[in-house]
Design a protein with these regions (language model features):
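Phosphate-group recognition and catalysis centered on beta-loop-alpha active-site segments
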Residues: 2-536
């Protein structure tokens, strides 16, 4: 009887202990899930400042400001704070070292790069056992092969995803593509196969692509990112892989300008990032600068060619301040010609380019400089370079010129090769606004932008590294639309800026602008027009 009672009491104690254990596991898992949602999951909202818990953890508003560091165990003593650490994990011991370090150092997250499957499950179980001690972001990364692709050094996707989902699911995935040659880009079949693997995931996924191939791979990568707002991009490099070691600032900018900025992270050496951050200021997207996704919401002011109007403009709400630049002859033979803000036929002004840039550069407004002659380009760009190097330009800068002959006129533009060469040699970190000379004939016999016109323009623009916008005359847009669509499709770095003369004497219909609005991407067409012609 006593033995039976002991067995019963033992069973009760065991059941109680097991219940407590399971309750502890449940609470720990719940807490982990909450922390995972807080630290790891990335959701796109309307307000940029709350898009990413990664950004929230580091108290940042923009991934461009996040610091990454590739490190080995020998770097443990020198790894700094406020950064994501990308570390290769080859054993449970290595994982323990980095987890311990992340707990000690303020504001450090871990990106765990697994190079083989043998340690993955062991490390995931170890993460699960220590989940209550994890108070920092953890990303689990593997370079994966899909559909039995034979990619040297890659993990098999099916096994990689299965191990994580069944062992430690409350984590952020990161999957990478390993280029094995300079032409080994991310192709459409790869991203479609990857999407089949990840489309039912509850957690966010980072796609990691080498900087050296990101521009050539951009269309399929962008397609994948558009499938879900829970998919994010990390552009990276690898010093150990020759084909992944090149970093172009303008390739990074090309991608950044074509997405909401919160969706692109940069695991790039700080030396490259410093140059990139500077380029992203003057050659960055005005939409990023103002926190918009709709180019029609950008507002403009024109012909700011004297000090009085300049001061009025600074007090106004216009986002873009535009002015024409001329080089004026000196009053005496000893003086050097200087660029001023003036629109022909006026050739005098109390506002020169240097003062204009110094005052407008940090005003919170974007700048557009319109050049009517080649002589004023070089001295103006040297001023831009000088002032920008001192931090005096903190907003996007557009450089505009008509470089080709366009509809309804025989007037020639500036020499395209000379104009572009000066920009690329003096200060290339700008958006190029490349247009055609045009006229509007009151007789009504107006033609639009022909296919040869846009093809010639594309031959110039497609060779450029910078973002390019094409200013097109509003009265000619509707009849040219098919050709302009063709032009836009040649590069994701292209946009249109629809303009009309000031004061407007062209026959421009709101209906035509609404047509353009309804048949284009909101981020790809700017409307530099009177308010009554802005489409909704």
């Amino acid at each position: 009887m006593k033995v039976k009672l002991y067995y019963q009491l033992g069973g009760v104690v065991f059941l109680f202990g097991f219940t407590v254990y399971m309750l502890h596991r449940y609470i720990s898992a719940s807490r982990l899930e909450e922390r995972s949602l807080e630290l790891l999951q990335v959701k796109i909202q309307d307000e940029p400042s709350i898009h990413s818990p990664l950004l929230k953890f580091f108290r940042l508003h923009d991934p461009i400001d996040m610091k990454w560091q590739h490190a080995s165990s020998s770097d443990l003593g020198i790894v700094g704070a406020n950064r994501m650490m990308a570390v290769d994990i080859d054993s449970k011991t290595t994982l323990n070292l980095w987890m311990h370090h992340a707990r000690k150092v303020k504001d450090v997250g871990l990106k765990l790069n697994f190079k083989n499957m043998s340690v993955l499950e062991t490390c995931l179980l170890h993460l699960d056992d220590n989940n209550y001690n994890i108070h920092y972001p953890v990303i689990v990364h593997g370079d994966v092969a899909l559909d039995n692709a034979e990619e040297q050094g890659a993990l098999f996707a099916d096994v990689f995803f299965y191990k994580i989902r069944t062992t430690y699911p409350a984590v952020t995935f990161s999957v990478g593509h390993i280029p094995s040659s300079a032409t080994n880009t991310v192709h459409q079949l790869y991203v479609e196969a990857l999407w089949k693997q990840i489309r039912n995931f509850k957690q966010p996924v980072f796609i990691t692509v080498c900087a050296s191939v990101i521009r050539m791979s951009w269309l399929p990568v962008r397609w994948l990112l558009n499938q879900s707002k829970d998919i994010f991009l990390i552009i990276t490099y690898s010093s150990s892989n020759y084909f992944c070691s090149e970093v172009s600032v303008f390739d990074l900018l090309f991608v950044r300008n074509d997405l909401p900025k919160e969706r692109v992270f940069f695991d790039i050496p700080e030396a490259n990032m410093d140059r990139f951050r500077k380029a992203a200021v003057t050659a960055g997207s005005p939409l990023h600068y103002f926190g918009l996704q709709d180019a029609a919401k950008i507002t403009w002011t024109h012909r700011v060619t004297n000090m009085k109007y300049f001061k009025e403009t600074m007090k106004g709400d216009a986002m873009f301040i535009e002015s024409d630049v001329l080089l004026v002859s000196p009053d005496s033979k000893d003086d050097t010609a200087i660029p001023i803000m003036a629109h022909p036929p006026d050739v005098r002004s109390d506002l020169n380019v240097k003062d204009f840039l110094r005052m407008a550069g940090t005003s919170g407004k974007c700048i557009k400089l319109d050049f009517k002659d080649l002589e004023s380009v070089e001295p103006s760009l040297r001023l831009v370079s000088e002032i920008s190097s001192d931090g005096g330009i903190t907003a996007p800068l557009w450089i505009n010129a008509d470089i080709l002959t366009g509809p309804n006129t025989d007037k020639t533009g500036l020499n395209a090769s000379v104009f572009l060469s000066k920009i690329n040699s003096i200060f290339p970190e700008v958006t190029l606004s490349l247009g055609w000379t045009t006229e509007w004939l009151r007789t009504g016999d107006n033609v639009g932008y022909s296919l040869p016109m846009v093809q010639t323009m594309n031959r110039h623009a497609i060779l450029l590294r910078q973002p390019v916008t094409f200013p097109v005359r509003a009265s000619l847009v509707r009849k040219s639309w098919d050709n302009l669509v063709w032009l836009l499709r040649q590069s994701r770095g292209y946009s249109l800026t629809i303009w009309t003369p000031f004061p407007n004497e062209d026959a421009v219909e709101l209906e035509d602008m609404q047509f353009v609005r309804n048949h284009s991407e909101a981020a790809k067409v700017y409307f530099d027009l009177p308010q009554e012609l802005i489409p909704t």
